[in-house]
């Protein structure tokens, strides 16, 4: 079966050893590369599921989430963090990705910048993230991620895994000192000009007509277009359901499926 996770990833369970390489190879022509972070590495980056189509959003954060993903995957073998790192991007509407409870939470602002919370998290010793930046330039996102990794590697707990998440740096350093050290590392990271981003959200040119009244239908900011919510119980999907979804989506021009 397949499991849709809270970090917007898809897990495949109960596979045999022979099935794994076959699935990995078959996924390549579909644009799915089965590489990612696990263990003491970055986790899948979250973004508001309706970013780019949600009424009232500040802007579409998907390009920045994708750029952050590629950057973290490119360096994850070269860094040694105490524990995992969770990053989320919110489009500025309802914060369904809970940015204040992430190691890094970027919240889009109407002026094109981000508000940034750091060192938050649930679980044992939970902490609300501390506000590290009010108006972070969107082009500088990767510098802030690099700064957090450096800070985590410098001040994270390598001896006790139960206290090895970024939120515990609020205890060891204190919120104000953590913010100061973090911003100092961000400034140092800016020596690498290659991390500067120049991104533009993709334009949606598809149009629609008519209206749809259904409890699972969500009106997009594009007139006449809708998103449809489907929430499998416990996030579990049987393979047959994916086939049904694929058969349905293949009949709808310009649509996409998001986790």
Residue ranges and their predicted role:
Residues 1-259:
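Peripheral terminal and linker regions in Fe-S/redox and tRNA-modifying enzymes
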């Amino acid at each position: 079966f397949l499991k849709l996770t809270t970090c917007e990833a898809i897990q495949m369970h109960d596979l045999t050893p022979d099935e794994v390489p076959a699935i990995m190879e078959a996924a390549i022509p579909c644009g799915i590369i089965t590489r990612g972070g696990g263990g003491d590495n970055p986790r899948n980056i979250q973004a508001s599921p309706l970013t780019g189509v949600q009424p009232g959003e500040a802007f579409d954060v998907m390009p920045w989430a994708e750029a952050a993903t590629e950057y973290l995957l490119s360096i994850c073998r070269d860094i040694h963090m105490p524990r995992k790192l969770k990053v989320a991007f919110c489009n500025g509407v309802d914060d369904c990705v809970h940015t204040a409870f992430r190691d890094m939470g970027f919240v889009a602002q109407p002026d094109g910048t981000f508000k940034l919370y750091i060192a938050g998290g649930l679980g044992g010793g939970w902490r609300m993230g501390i506000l590290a930046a009010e108006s972070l330039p969107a082009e500088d996102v990767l510098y802030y991620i690099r700064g957090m990794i450096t800070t985590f590697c410098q001040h994270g707990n390598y001896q006790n895994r139960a206290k090895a998440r970024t939120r515990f740096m609020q205890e060891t350093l204190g919120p104000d000192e953590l913010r100061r050290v973090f911003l100092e590392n961000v400034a140092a990271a800016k020596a690498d000009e290659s991390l500067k981003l120049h991104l533009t959200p993709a334009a949606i040119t598809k149009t629609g007509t008519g209206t749809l009244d259904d409890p699972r239908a969500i009106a997009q900011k594009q007139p006449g277009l809708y998103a449809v919510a489907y929430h499998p119980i416990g996030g579990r999907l049987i393979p047959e359901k994916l086939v049904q979804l694929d058969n349905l989506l293949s009949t709808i021009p310009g649509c996409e499926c998001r986790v």
